[in-house]
Amino acid sequence: MNGLLLTATGGALPGRTVTNDELSQMVDTSDAWIASRTGIRTRHWCTAEESAATLAIAAARQALERSGLSPSDISCCVCATLSAPDATPSVAVGCRRRWVCRRTGPRWISTRPAPAFCTAWPWRGGCWKRWRAVRLVIGCEALSRLMDPADRSTCVLFGDGAGAAIFRLADTPFALTLGARGSDVLHAGGPDRNGSAPITMDGRAVFRFAVETLQVPPRGAGRNAAHPQRSVVGVCHQANSRIIDHCVKALNADPAKFYKNMDRHGNTSAASIPVALNELAERGLLPAGASRWPVSASAAPDMGRRDFSV
């Protein structure tokens, strides 16, 4: 399989910014308590007019505009999310319908119901071989709609947002690691779970899982080049600052190479890596030809890791 070339990014954040001090008025917590344990200071929550779908559409449109491509140039679109506003039509379908050129667009579209942006890339392996053109990958979340605002263990962690990335196949090395723990589950409320928290999480177990998976180097043709010590920057799932710090120390890597933005956005699940990539691109921190080591160790028991170039 060829490597991937990142050609453009886009991002979108909700209009409402929620500070730790604001949360301290809702639950028994404080800015110092949250920041010291997670590194999070603020996060964005959707307003009544916003959703994971509207954010995804905005991020995808921005990526398209920056790439100079038209919707008809996109041969495949995949969206990763666990907080889509509707079971059907999918968020990916909604993105296609809202593009400027509505009668043309991806020949194949899907929404992956998972909180890991990185696992959405290899999931499309058959598409890469069938349509050797341009792919759009989106990660979007509106986790504020799934949280119990009275549950301190979750409401302080999660935020909303969306990021989009456009990739091409390229003759560059690649490295890939995928994994899942089918015996572990993240419980989310449904119609038959009245009175239960929409999202519940064993924070200590998630921490252990994230630390374990983040320390495993990618496997593939570019394994050596993909190691974090040899990459220009590592883009990890932005769940908790302490998780990244712990892994950087264990890997004996340079902390300056690992990008963090959870202090401003919290844990946006599937959106965290594409939002981070978009910020790096906007700041001019993705020089052409650089190797990237994006890692997703999500709150749910699946993970993916992919090395690519820009």
Predicted feature descriptions by range:
Residues 1-48, 151-208, 212, 216, ...:
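Condensing-enzyme catalytic core mediating Claisen C-C bond formation in acyl metabolism
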Residues 59-75, 216-232, 280-285:
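Phosphate/pyrophosphate-binding loops at sites that engage ATP/ADP/AMP, CoA/4′-phosphopantetheine
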Residues 22-24, 29, 54, 83-93, ...:
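A structural motif shared across PLP-dependent enzymes of the aminotransferase-like
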Residues 7, 80, 111, 135-141, ...:
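Short beta-strand segments
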Residues 125, 129-159:
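Flexible, glycine-rich active-site loops centered on histidine and acidic residues
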Residues 40-42, 73-78, 97-111, 144-150, ...:
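Glycine/charged-rich beta-loop-alpha catalytic/anionic-binding loops adjacent to active sites
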